[in-house]
A protein has these predicted regions:
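Active-site nucleotide/adenylate-binding loops and adjacent lid/helix of ATP-dependent enzymes
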Residues: 91-180, 184-231, 318, 352, ...
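Short, low-complexity Ser/Thr-rich regulatory SLiMs
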Residues: 183-187, 245-249, 326
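Short, flexible active-site loops
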Residues: 204-214, 257-270
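Active-site "cap" helix and flanking loop/linker of ATP-utilizing ligase/carboxylase catalytic domains
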Residues: 222-243, 249, 259-307
């Protein structure tokens, strides 16, 4: 089967690498004019002139990035199956619709307001109590389109810096850790769930994801499973869905945002789970049985950002797996990730710190459960 992928970056690349053993072929449609997948057949189409050529080659279509024109995906749906559907993109690329969906399904979120002026932003900051986080309703990812207000008087500056006509303003959450759920749903409605991962962000960009969590209460995992299962069923979803959450001090979970695709916080599954998120996504969209999501060992994903480190020394570390994206170095750019696998979380922390020391731009590792090791 020829899988069509909208986008030609590292997520599409890793989908292809997971799909070749399944006998899949891949055709990428790149609308940026700057593809970086370095694999498969790429149709570069910044002027939207080659959609018919793309459709003629593929059997089913998926995507690696949700910030696509909904109209493009809806047009493709007239000709080929698209998984996840355009409805998932429509919700996930608009924070107002996303929050409304969470509210409708009784999935708790931080308190929020929708504002359309600097004056409304200031009023919302006073009502919710600072600090608050202001986010663009559309186009925000990896910390872009956001500002933290420490006082209501900062509203005018924040409004101007974000530069959007509508913002979501969220109350600041005193969380213990940021976590994420990765789940996959097949065409037949079967759903499977990966163990929850703890994520460490710096400047809004993910740096480390670790799973499974040694101190995670079973009930918390079950609650997260229920939340994401509700979303999967409501959207009649097919493929991998990621749900990012805050875990508070009392163990409750607050939904932050979701992503309708394979996700950076699920990269640990490539070496730390029986079936990777990439293979399971491909199984789902082709109507194949879903693979086991069981973790085989404590695993940490380390993002390599901006500048590569000493890869030779890194590969000398036992059970350390380097996944390079074949991209040129540039400040803030995701170049690769490293999956570190160990028999215990104590050993894992030691190995991740050894890996971190070999990366020039890697921040210190901070895990919420470190004191219990």
């Amino acid at each position: 089967m020829n899988i069509g992928v909208l986008g030609a970056g590292q997520l599409g690349r890793m989908l292809a690498l997971a799909g070749y053993p399944l006998g899949n072929r891949f055709t990428f449609l790149d609308t940026t004019g700057n593809p970086s997948a370095g694999i498969g057949e790429v149709i570069v189409d910044p002027d939207n002139q080659h959609l018919a050529e793309f459709l003629a080659k593929v059997d089913v279509v998926t995507y690696e990035f949700e910030h696509l024109p909904v109209s493009l995906v809806q047009e493709i749906e007239k000709h080929k199956p698209v998984y996840p559907s355009s409805r998932a993109i429509e919700v996930c690329q608009n924070r107002v619709e996303e929050k409304a969906l969470f509210d409708r399904l009784n999935i708790p979120t931080p308190a929020y307001r929708v504002v359309e002026s600097a004056e409304q932003l200031e009023a919302a900051a006073r009502e919710l109590g600072c600090p608050v986080v202001a986010k663009s309703v559309t186009e925000g990812y990896d910390g872009k389109g956001q500002a933290v207000l420490k006082a209501p008087e900062e509203a005018a500056e924040a409004w101007q810096s974000i530069g959007h006509a509508q913002l979501i303003v969220e109350a600041f959450v005193d969380f213990v850790r940021e976590v994420s759920m990765i789940a996959v749903r097949g065409r037949d409605g079967e759903a499977v769930f990966y163990p929850m991962a703890e994520n460490q962000h710096v400047g809004g960009i993910l740096r480390y994801s670790v799973a499974p969590l040694p101190d995670l209460d079973v009930q918390v995992q079950q609650t997260a499973d229920t939340y994401i299962r509700t979303l999967l069923d409501e959207l009649d979803y097919v493929g991998v869905l990621a749900l990012e959450l805050f875990q508070t001090r009392d163990g409750s979970l607050l939904a932050n945002e979701m992503a309708p695709r394979v996700h950076n916080s699920g990269h640990w599954t490539m070496d730390g789970a029986v079936t990777s998120q990439f293979e399971n996504h491909l199984r789902a969209i082709q109507g194949l049985p879903l693979g086991s999501t069981v973790a085989i060992a404590p695993t940490c994903m380390v993002n390599v950002i901006g500048q590569e480190g000493d890869n030779v020394a890194m590969l000398k570390l036992a059970n350390t797996h380097l996944h390079r994206y074949d991209k040129a170095e540039r400040a803030g750019r995701k170049l690769a990730h490293v999956n570190v696998v160990a028999t215990t979380h104590t050993e894992l922390l030691e190995k991740v710190r050894a890996c971190q020391a070999l990366l020039p731009d890697a921040p210190p590792v901070e895990w919420s459960f470190e004191s219990s090791l």
